[in-house]
Amino acid sequence: MLVKSSAAPVRTAGRPRDERVDRDVLEATRQLLVEVGYPALTIDAIARRANVSRPAIYRRWRSKAQLVHEAVYPADEDQTFHLPETGDFAADLGTIITSTLEVFSRPEVLAAVPGLLAEQRDDPELRNLLARRLEADARAEFAAFVERAVARGEARSGLRGDVLFDAFVGAALFRVAAGPDEVDLPAYADQLTELLVHATRLPDGENHP
Protein backbone atom coordinates (compact mmCIF):
# COMPACT_ATOMS: atom_id res chain seq x y z
CA MET A 1 0.00 0.00 0.00
CA LEU A 2 1.07 3.58 -0.41
CA VAL A 3 0.68 4.86 3.11
CA LYS A 4 3.79 4.30 5.16
CA SER A 5 4.45 4.62 8.87
CA SER A 6 6.07 7.93 9.60
CA ALA A 7 7.99 9.13 12.59
CA ALA A 8 6.48 8.74 16.04
CA PRO A 9 3.32 10.80 16.57
CA VAL A 10 3.92 14.35 17.77
CA ARG A 11 2.89 14.78 21.39
CA THR A 12 3.69 17.31 24.04
CA ALA A 13 6.12 16.38 26.80
CA GLY A 14 4.69 15.10 30.06
CA ARG A 15 4.25 12.10 32.27
CA PRO A 16 4.31 8.58 30.82
CA ARG A 17 1.22 7.77 28.78
CA ASP A 18 -1.53 5.39 29.76
CA GLU A 19 -1.80 3.27 26.61
CA ARG A 20 -5.42 2.45 27.41
CA VAL A 21 -6.28 6.14 27.18
CA ASP A 22 -4.51 6.34 23.82
CA ARG A 23 -6.47 3.39 22.45
CA ASP A 24 -9.81 4.67 23.76
CA VAL A 25 -9.28 8.19 22.40
CA LEU A 26 -8.19 6.97 18.97
CA GLU A 27 -11.13 4.58 18.72
CA ALA A 28 -13.56 7.30 19.83
CA THR A 29 -12.10 9.62 17.21
CA ARG A 30 -12.58 7.05 14.44
CA GLN A 31 -16.16 6.35 15.51
CA LEU A 32 -17.13 10.02 15.69
CA LEU A 33 -15.46 10.84 12.39
CA VAL A 34 -17.75 8.37 10.66
CA GLU A 35 -20.81 9.49 12.65
CA VAL A 36 -20.52 13.30 12.46
CA GLY A 37 -17.71 14.09 9.99
CA TYR A 38 -14.55 16.12 10.42
CA PRO A 39 -16.05 19.65 10.64
CA ALA A 40 -18.45 18.71 13.46
CA LEU A 41 -15.91 16.64 15.38
CA THR A 42 -14.84 18.24 18.67
CA ILE A 43 -12.35 17.40 21.38
CA ASP A 44 -15.19 17.62 23.93
CA ALA A 45 -17.17 14.95 22.08
CA ILE A 46 -14.11 12.71 21.80
CA ALA A 47 -13.39 13.12 25.51
CA ARG A 48 -16.96 12.17 26.41
CA ARG A 49 -16.97 9.14 24.11
CA ALA A 50 -13.59 7.93 25.43
CA ASN A 51 -14.47 8.79 29.05
CA VAL A 52 -11.34 10.90 29.49
CA SER A 53 -10.68 14.58 30.18
CA ARG A 54 -9.81 17.26 27.63
CA PRO A 55 -6.40 17.80 29.28
CA ALA A 56 -5.66 14.09 28.89
CA ILE A 57 -6.17 14.47 25.15
CA TYR A 58 -4.17 17.68 24.82
CA ARG A 59 -1.28 16.16 26.73
CA ARG A 60 -1.01 13.64 23.90
CA TRP A 61 -2.03 15.58 20.79
CA ARG A 62 -1.57 19.29 20.14
CA SER A 63 -4.62 19.72 17.92
CA LYS A 64 -7.71 18.00 16.59
CA ALA A 65 -6.02 17.62 13.22
CA GLN A 66 -3.00 15.80 14.66
CA LEU A 67 -5.27 13.53 16.70
CA VAL A 68 -7.35 12.71 13.63
CA HIS A 69 -4.19 12.09 11.61
CA GLU A 70 -3.03 9.42 14.05
CA ALA A 71 -6.52 7.95 14.41
CA VAL A 72 -6.88 7.26 10.70
CA TYR A 73 -3.23 6.29 10.13
CA PRO A 74 -2.27 4.51 13.39
CA ALA A 75 1.45 4.59 14.14
CA ASP A 76 1.42 0.96 15.30
CA GLU A 77 -0.28 -0.33 12.13
CA ASP A 78 1.80 -2.02 9.45
CA GLN A 79 1.69 0.63 6.75
CA THR A 80 4.95 -0.21 5.04
CA PHE A 81 5.03 0.47 1.33
CA HIS A 82 4.93 -3.04 -0.13
CA LEU A 83 5.75 -3.26 -3.83
CA PRO A 84 4.64 -6.45 -5.57
CA GLU A 85 7.33 -7.57 -7.97
CA THR A 86 6.00 -10.44 -10.06
CA GLY A 87 7.61 -9.27 -13.29
CA ASP A 88 4.20 -8.37 -14.74
CA PHE A 89 4.15 -4.57 -14.69
CA ALA A 90 0.44 -4.20 -15.48
CA ALA A 91 -0.62 -6.69 -12.80
CA ASP A 92 1.71 -5.19 -10.22
CA LEU A 93 0.55 -1.66 -10.98
CA GLY A 94 -3.05 -2.83 -10.60
CA THR A 95 -2.26 -4.32 -7.19
CA ILE A 96 -0.63 -1.08 -6.03
CA ILE A 97 -3.54 1.04 -7.25
CA THR A 98 -6.14 -1.26 -5.68
CA SER A 99 -4.42 -1.33 -2.28
CA THR A 100 -3.99 2.45 -2.32
CA LEU A 101 -7.68 3.00 -3.09
CA GLU A 102 -8.65 0.54 -0.36
CA VAL A 103 -6.68 2.52 2.23
CA PHE A 104 -8.14 5.84 1.12
CA SER A 105 -11.67 4.38 1.04
CA ARG A 106 -11.85 3.33 4.67
CA PRO A 107 -14.86 5.13 6.21
CA GLU A 108 -12.77 7.03 8.75
CA VAL A 109 -10.27 8.07 6.05
CA LEU A 110 -13.06 9.25 3.74
CA ALA A 111 -14.35 11.39 6.61
CA ALA A 112 -10.95 12.73 7.67
CA VAL A 113 -8.90 13.45 4.56
CA PRO A 114 -10.81 16.47 3.17
CA GLY A 115 -10.55 18.20 6.55
CA LEU A 116 -6.89 17.31 7.00
CA LEU A 117 -6.04 18.57 3.52
CA ALA A 118 -7.79 21.87 4.29
CA GLU A 119 -6.07 22.30 7.66
CA GLN A 120 -2.58 21.47 6.46
CA ARG A 121 -2.47 24.62 4.35
CA ASP A 122 -2.08 26.71 7.53
CA ASP A 123 -0.30 24.10 9.66
CA PRO A 124 3.26 23.34 8.46
CA GLU A 125 3.74 20.64 11.09
CA LEU A 126 0.61 18.81 9.97
CA ARG A 127 1.64 19.27 6.33
CA ASN A 128 4.98 17.58 7.08
CA LEU A 129 3.23 14.75 8.92
CA LEU A 130 0.89 14.15 5.99
CA ALA A 131 3.72 14.29 3.46
CA ARG A 132 5.71 11.69 5.39
CA ARG A 133 2.64 9.54 5.94
CA LEU A 134 1.40 9.65 2.36
CA GLU A 135 4.77 9.34 0.67
CA ALA A 136 7.73 8.54 2.94
CA ASP A 137 9.99 6.38 0.76
CA ALA A 138 7.12 5.36 -1.50
CA ARG A 139 7.85 7.83 -4.29
CA ALA A 140 11.49 6.76 -4.68
CA GLU A 141 10.64 3.06 -4.42
CA PHE A 142 7.88 3.41 -6.99
CA ALA A 143 10.21 5.26 -9.37
CA ALA A 144 12.69 2.38 -9.11
CA PHE A 145 9.84 -0.07 -9.77
CA VAL A 146 8.99 1.82 -12.98
CA GLU A 147 12.64 1.93 -14.04
CA ARG A 148 12.83 -1.86 -13.75
CA ALA A 149 9.71 -2.19 -15.91
CA VAL A 150 11.28 0.08 -18.53
CA ALA A 151 14.47 -2.02 -18.45
CA ARG A 152 12.39 -5.17 -19.06
CA GLY A 153 10.66 -3.53 -22.01
CA GLU A 154 7.25 -3.51 -20.27
CA ALA A 155 6.99 0.28 -20.19
CA ARG A 156 8.03 2.89 -22.71
CA SER A 157 11.40 4.55 -22.61
CA GLY A 158 11.42 7.89 -20.84
CA LEU A 159 8.43 7.10 -18.62
CA ARG A 160 8.73 9.11 -15.40
CA GLY A 161 7.82 7.21 -12.28
CA ASP A 162 7.09 10.38 -10.32
CA VAL A 163 4.47 11.48 -12.86
CA LEU A 164 2.80 8.06 -12.81
CA PHE A 165 2.90 8.12 -9.00
CA ASP A 166 1.20 11.53 -8.94
CA ALA A 167 -1.43 10.31 -11.42
CA PHE A 168 -2.79 7.44 -9.35
CA VAL A 169 -2.25 9.02 -5.93
CA GLY A 170 -3.96 12.15 -7.20
CA ALA A 171 -6.88 10.06 -8.47
CA ALA A 172 -7.16 8.34 -5.09
CA LEU A 173 -7.09 11.65 -3.20
CA PHE A 174 -9.66 13.21 -5.52
CA ARG A 175 -11.86 10.16 -5.04
CA VAL A 176 -11.69 10.78 -1.27
CA ALA A 177 -11.98 14.57 -1.32
CA ALA A 178 -14.56 15.14 -4.04
CA GLY A 179 -15.76 11.86 -5.47
CA PRO A 180 -19.26 10.38 -5.16
CA ASP A 181 -20.20 8.57 -1.96
CA GLU A 182 -20.79 5.24 -3.67
CA VAL A 183 -18.14 3.90 -6.03
CA ASP A 184 -17.61 0.39 -7.36
CA LEU A 185 -14.05 0.28 -6.07
CA PRO A 186 -12.82 -2.81 -7.97
CA ALA A 187 -14.22 -1.47 -11.24
CA TYR A 188 -12.74 1.97 -10.57
CA ALA A 189 -9.33 0.44 -9.80
CA ASP A 190 -9.47 -1.72 -12.94
CA GLN A 191 -10.36 1.23 -15.18
CA LEU A 192 -7.71 3.47 -13.64
CA THR A 193 -5.12 0.72 -14.06
CA GLU A 194 -6.12 0.15 -17.69
CA LEU A 195 -5.87 3.87 -18.42
CA LEU A 196 -2.44 4.24 -16.84
CA VAL A 197 -1.02 1.03 -18.30
CA HIS A 198 -2.10 2.21 -21.75
CA ALA A 199 -0.33 5.52 -21.16
CA THR A 200 2.88 3.79 -20.10
CA ARG A 201 2.94 1.80 -23.34
CA LEU A 202 2.47 4.63 -25.83
CA PRO A 203 5.34 4.63 -28.35
CA ASP A 204 7.75 7.53 -28.01
CA GLY A 205 6.54 10.50 -29.98
CA GLU A 206 2.96 9.27 -30.39
CA ASN A 207 0.27 11.62 -29.17
CA HIS A 208 -2.96 10.57 -27.55
CA PRO A 209 -5.92 11.60 -29.72
What is the role of each PLM region?
Residues 1-49, 55, 65-66:
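Basic, helix-initiating cap at the start of DNA-binding domains
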Residues 1-10, 95, 136, 140, ...:
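C-terminal peripheral helix-coil segments that are non-catalytic and often amphipathic
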Residues 22, 43, 65, 86, ...:
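Short, structured helix-loop boundary elements
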Residues 40, 63-68, 77-79, 93:
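Short amphipathic alpha-helical segment with a characteristic S/N-K-E followed by hydrophobic residues
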Residues 80-113:
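Hydrophobic alpha-helical connector segments
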Residues 98-104, 113-122, 193-200:
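Helix-loop "lid/cap" segments that line or gate small-molecule binding pockets
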Residues 107, 111-114, 124-151, 161:
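Amphipathic alpha-helical packing segments from all-alpha helical-bundle domains
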